[in-house]
Amino acid sequence: MAKQSKNRVKLNKQYKSIGKIPVSALKKISEFMDLPALARDIRSSENNMVKHNHRHIDELEEQLKQLGITKEGYAEFVAKNYNQIRLGNKPLSLILAVLLENINHIAAVHLHYDKRENFWLVTTVHAIKPRNLEKIPLIWKR
């Protein structure tokens, strides 16, 4: 058992906490998936984002460089400013989106719930077109 505890501490060090999901949103999310009541923490890891979906990141990274923003900074911006939560395309996954007026693309991050560690992990960062976002089921809105 002690060995498992050491692994957990080591695992958590690689993730940075970048936001929280409101309790009101968790109530809505629980209508779509079975989650513990305290599954609010959103965490990020550069290695994890690259591992899960390098195509989106490569496309976005050049644009972000021009703006002087890192991938991690982009994920953190979305995690702190999202105004919609949509259902992800995989089990236990969500999309956080920042919708602003008069914009052609929407800042978005994909999250996956880690049951073992009880947090939401950013798996992908990207910009999505409004018409594509509208096709994804809306769970919660500010």
Spans of features found by a protein language model:
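Ribonuclease/tRNase effector modules and their secretory precursors
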Residues: 1-142
